[in-house]
Structure formats: structure tokens, C-alpha cells
């Protein structure tokens, strides 16, 4: 949410649900539209620093920003910043399930096994409340050697062991020289590591005054290398003239060359709000060139659409070539929808002379029943439902939206999506928050639910504000806030998970505590508004999670925590086959006088193992050597070549699949700066 500078109360108008627009796992034939406005040659900066213009299709615009070089962050002097010690007002009245509509949860897990979840590896404090604001909007991501966190109005960079290399710094420091972003520090930040480009993406929104008059901006910066303390390239996009781009969420989608953003849009004239889908021109941004964006206002496609999330790609495998980018939301029947479900849309962007965007409804997936209403006694708008010890102040569960990220993976044989949101684990008789999580899967055709569950062990604890992700082996983890109204259960941090082979629809590895709380928040109900679970690009196994907690009772004394953990089975080689059964006993010798038959000749020796050349392109050199050795081959000549994929194999000879004698040498080409 907005970073403590303003108090904004904007009504989110809801139109009636259009049943004819909802398709059950069937493609839409009428909901996609295309931009047709040309922007000129890609290398052209059109008429200034940034711009936007209407396109011919309803609710669409196109725009651009020039690129601004940023010196290394470790050398930058922090930008001027005025602290404003106030909490924020609620930003919308998004659909909340109504009292009386509650039904039992159809996928609740009442028990949790103990001592199976791995403990934290790294576990250190991140940024605390330097801005005097609430909530912190905690998020961050991990790269090859660093963790970068951006909490509301400040970012910081750490080594993976928690050493601070760039101290907490006002967010607008990242945008020197830009016309608006250099002086406006509004928050709602997102940090992502783009492992396909070997660069970081960091963003926050910006506006002048109190956010009630336009235009409105999105500030985006891309690092020059995989080292976030080095130089960056900044962009200052004017994204709308009259609608505030609140609560933006990003997803990297390389096969569409897009940094894709979704955001609730709040008109300054008080008319109905809507959702927006923005695509920013990734291939030009990672090379620090002027870049364009395309935008679809979803008001023209579905005026009742609630908050949506764009898929964010993880892992070494790219999405399939030209695959559209999934966008999802969860819908509670208690908020006026026909049934509890997940809606799936597909976004496609093109970046020729005439850029285009198409957002098409794929359909919806019925889910096990859930309720996002946590009780009619919760203060309006029925989200402030989490009790704390020693205070009557309840904190915000944000049960009415899918929580960041929508984590995507391409496992080759199938694709997967994972996300979580807060529901009532004790419905209909109770009002205790639990974590609903999903693993969606697609082999061909449409997405479907592979696993789903509500993690709500019968221990009286509330679990809320979660985030989910999957590792390279298909294991899933969910991090979240945990606590209740009885000491010592102050707002803390926990996580749970499942292995790929665990029983379906359960977090069968149980729960582990990341960091206990030590106090309550008494001055504001705001919490979150999001947290972040990511996976380490180095091993594709280690999860990293960050969110807030309370250490000592006070008004808004939040702190943040950054921790990692890893399932031991992830990335391990398959177990060896069982030994063959013992041979049967020899038959008794024949009676004399005939002599026993001669013993059978020994079996021929097994054939010498062959070298079957594996595919190692895209792997780091050490991993490539390991894979070559396991294939009964050996590493030959290693040549270095300039590439954006530093340290990764970009060429091999011979190609994969060739069979040679054992120990045959495979020559490699490795990327360098």
C-alpha cells in the first residue's frame, strides 16, 4: 500500500456479476482485444521523457519512457525523504463474503506433523519501521549472491548470510534524474530477480499530492548485472492520466518479453474502479534502451473482476515459446459469484512497430468450498479479524484477494502455478483464519487443480497473509503470519510444506516456526499488505521468505524477517535400484555313480558403459560438469564467450544425445561478461 504519506479512501465500485462471461474451463471467443496504435521505430524516444496515449480498442493505452543510467547503488547518496508517521486508510471495498453465506471448508487440514519441515538456514532481521508507516508491504527476492528487500519506502541489500551491503535507503534513490520518480517516494514496491536475464527488477508507484489527481506513474529500475549493488537503468512511466495504479504486482514472462503488472485502478472522479494489466517492454529494458508499455483496462472486459495476479516464472526452464501469461484470481460465492472458484485469464503482448496486448478469459476452475468472511463482528470492512494478546486491536487478514506471488514453473512434462490466500478454517461455526493454497497444473489445454488445501490445524492459532512457491523438484512451501489472542502467541512467522510425492491436498511435512512474535501492534489494524516466497536460482531448491512480525508491543513497531530453508530431498539423485534377490540354492547332486554335471560357464561381463552426451546448455559450469560425468563422459575444452548468461553454459559440442565411448570429451562454451 501507499507508503505512509497519505490517507486515501477510494471506493471500489462493483458491477453485477455477468454470468454469460464466465466459462467453465473453456476458452473465450470474445473477450480479447488488440492495441492498434503505432509507436514508431523501437529505438525512437518519442517527444520527451515519457508518454501515454489511447489506442483504438476500448480501455487500452500505449506509452513509453526513456532510459536513465543509475550509478552503482553502493555509491549513491540517499535521496531526500520526509518521514510521515501515520498509518493508512483502507484503500478499497473489494468484495467480501457476506455473513450468512458461510459453509464448511471443503479442504481443511486439521492436523500437522511435527519435526518434518526443515529448519531455517539463513534467518536474520530485515528493514524495520523507519518510515513511521503501516503496513510494511514486505517483499524481496534472492539472486546468485544477494538478497534485496524493499519494504514500503526503503530498500536494502544483504549477502545470503545477512551481512548488510547496502543499508536501508529511501526508494526514490534508485531513480536519480527521472522527472517524477526521483522525488516521489510512495511505496507499494516489488523486487524480482530475473534469472533469465541475470538482472534485477525493482519498482514502486508514484503520484503527486494526495493521490486524488493524476497523472500517475510507475517507477521501474533494472540492474546492469546480477550484482544489485552495481549500476542500474531507471524508467519513469506515466501509466494513467486519471486512475491510480494502486497495489501493483509484477510477473516476469520472458517468452512474451514482458515485465507484466496488474493493479487495481481507482478513478479520481469517484466512478467505478477496475483492474489493469500492463506489459512493459522487457527486452529493451534489460539493455537500458527507451521502452514502451501496453495497457488493458479490464473494466471493458469484466467490470466485476476482483484483484488479479500475473504469473511470475521460476526455475531454469522458460515457459513454452509464445505461451500467453496466465493471470488468476480467486472468487468467493459469498461475494456474489455463482460458486467458489479460480478464474484464469491469458495475456499476450507483442512488441513490433505496432505493440499489442490481448487479455482473454480462458475460463474458471471450481475449487473446494471456502469462505473469506472471517466474522460479522470484525470491524468494517470485515477484514480486521486477527486477535492479539493484551489488546483489543485486531489486525487485517486481507482475505479478499489472492496473495503475491503467482509462482509459475515449467517442469517439461507439465506446467505448474502456486499461490495462496486467507480463508476461514473453522467455518461455519468459527472465525479463525487459515491458509488456502493451490497447485494448478497444465499438461495440454486448460489449467486444473492438482492439489489444494486449507492449512488450519486444530490448535487455536490464526494463519494469514501467506505466500507460496515450488522448488525444482516439485515440492511446495507456504509462509505466513501466525498468532492468536493468547500470550505468548504474538504475531510471528511460520511456514509449512509438502514434498512432490506426499499424499494429495495436504501440507504433509507439517509446520516450522521461522521467528516467534514478542509483542502486539496496538496503533493500527494494517498488516502485510503482502509477503513473498521465492526460490534460489543457484540450486533451484532453497526457499527464501520474508514478511513482518512484532517484537515489542507498541503502536506500529513492525520488523521484517528474511529466512531460507530447503527440503533435503530436493535436487538429490534418485535412489539406487534395490539389489537383486539372492540366487536360489543349487539342486541336490544326483545319486552316485554318475558324476555331477559340470558347472555352467560364467556369464559374460557386462558391456562397457557408453558416453551418452547430455544436454547442459543453461546450466552453471559446475552443474554441467557433474551432469557430463554422470553420463560417463568427461569435460573437454572450456571456452569463454561474452554473454548475458554469465557463468552458464551457452554452447556444447557435440550436441546432446550423441553416443560415444566412455570418457569421451564434451567441449563447452561458458558465458562471461
Language model features with spans:
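Sec-dependent, cleavable N-terminal signal peptides
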Residues: 1-35
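Residues at the start of alpha-helices and the adjacent loop-to-helix junctions
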Residues: 5-8, 132, 646
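Short, functionally important structural connectors and interaction interfaces within domains
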Residues: 17, 387-390, 395, 608, ...
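A short acidic, often aromatic-flanked loop/helix-cap motif at beta-alpha or helix-coil junctions
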Residues: 18, 242, 644
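C-terminal PAP-associated
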Residues: 29-573
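Ligand-recognition elements built from short beta-strands and adjacent flexible loops
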Residues: 574-673
